[in-house]
Amino acid sequence: MSAIRYELIKTDKQTGARLGKIHTPHGTFDTPMFMPVGTLATVKTMSPEELKAMGAGIILSNTYHLWLRPGEELIREAGGLHKFMNWDQPILTDSGGFQVFSLSKMRDIKEEGVHFRNHLNGDKLFLSPEKAIQIQNALGSDIMMSFDECPPYPASHEYMKKSVERTSRWAERGLQAHARPEDQGLFGIVQGGAYEDLRAQSAKDLVSLDFPGYSIGGLSVGEPKDVMNRVLEHTTPLLPANKPRYLMGVGSPDSLIDGVIRGVDMFDCVLPTRIARNGTCMTSSGRLVIKNAKFTHDFRPIDENCDCYTCKNYSRAYIRHLIRCEETFGIRLTTYHNLHFLLNLMKQVRSAIMEDRLADFREEFFEQYGFNRPDAKNF
């Protein structure tokens, strides 16, 4: 029996978007869901209690980074990642593939895996489909990812075809290496870039392996948003309706809504936490850069329509002062707000699906946020 079970609750009559629940060994979370990223077993500056309070049903941690520091064996010794970081709800881990291909300047892709340099100290390392699974088995996450190749955008059709075929072979090897299928659900990752025929081939290969869930990788890597939407429209119908669908690395408000409309259930991205550290905030009326001089004497909250801890207690002027002085508390406040904003957005999306009005909600949100303006600023 699989460790992961998807329950479809309702389909939006306007768009076909899905409202559901995903059941895991560490509890159930509602979908569509945005997952905060805790790269090194922590969502930067946030406590587990704060994440739960703002509605984070699941968080993500990075296999590559935890493999390097502190090492999977230490985490196994601690009783697994949940105990190590004191988080008793679901955890998803990636495979390490994206970091290998994005952080390491020197890498050599072979059939057996990837030889590359540690981005911290230059040491030679090797990661294979089997090793990626072994590390994740030691971490004990509820949802694991297959090891995949992450080609850059754009890549030639010829290269992408070879890459997709290799990723499919790696997925099968990872499945065979998985030692704890009743405790941890392993997702396959659909690749293929912007090529619809290769996306179809990748989906067919992975669906034939009967994973308990499917990720859509290789998007949000520099392609235009209309290309991402087109790929999603083509890809999600090829995936089983009774399994979860996860769009990797996407976290801007417009892309979350557009992804849900195209049948996606799960999302993750470092965007809300990364931009928070620079003082950039997501608000119901668009992007707000708190360091700007115009907020020096502005004693309103970051977002007057937000009921998060930050907005209920602190002003733009105060937070601007903290960020400009590089005070950690300022980063905590902007991080809290941005995560709350996206988690609350997904809550609104779930309500809109329940009420069969997601297309209307999208139009209202885009109008208020400013995405419909020709000078719209995104992240």
From Swiss-Prot:
InterPro entries (UniProt xref): ArchSynthase1/Queuine_TRR (IPR050076), TGT (IPR004803), TGT-like_sf (IPR036511), tRNA_ribo_trans-like (IPR002616)
The EC number of this protein is 2.4.2.29
Catalytic machinery residues: 94 (proton acceptor), 268 (nucleophile)
GO MF entry, a single one:
tRNA-guanosine(34) queuine transglycosylase activity
Q: What is the uppermost EC class here?
A: transferase
Q: Which GO terms describe its cellular component?
A: cytosol
Assembly state and interactors? Answer: Homodimer. Within each dimer, one monomer is responsible for RNA recognition and catalysis, while the other monomer binds to the replacement base PreQ1.
What is the stated purpose of this protein? Catalyzes the base-exchange of a guanine (G) residue with the queuine precursor 7-aminomethyl-7-deazaguanine (PreQ1) at position 34 (anticodon wobble position) in tRNAs with GU(N) anticodons (tRNA-Asp, -Asn, -His and -Tyr). Catalysis occurs through a double-displacement mechanism. The nucleophile active site attacks the C1' of nucleotide 34 to detach the guanine base from the RNA, forming a covalent enzyme-RNA intermediate. The proton acceptor active site deprotonates the incoming PreQ1, allowing a nucleophilic attack on the C1' of the ribose to form the product.
The record's comment on protein family reads: Belongs to the queuine tRNA-ribosyltransferase family.
UniProt-recorded name of the protein: Queuine tRNA-ribosyltransferase
Specify the species: Listeria welshimeri serovar 6b (strain ATCC 35897 / DSM 20650 / CCUG 15529 / CIP 8149 / NCTC 11857 / SLCC 5334 / V8)
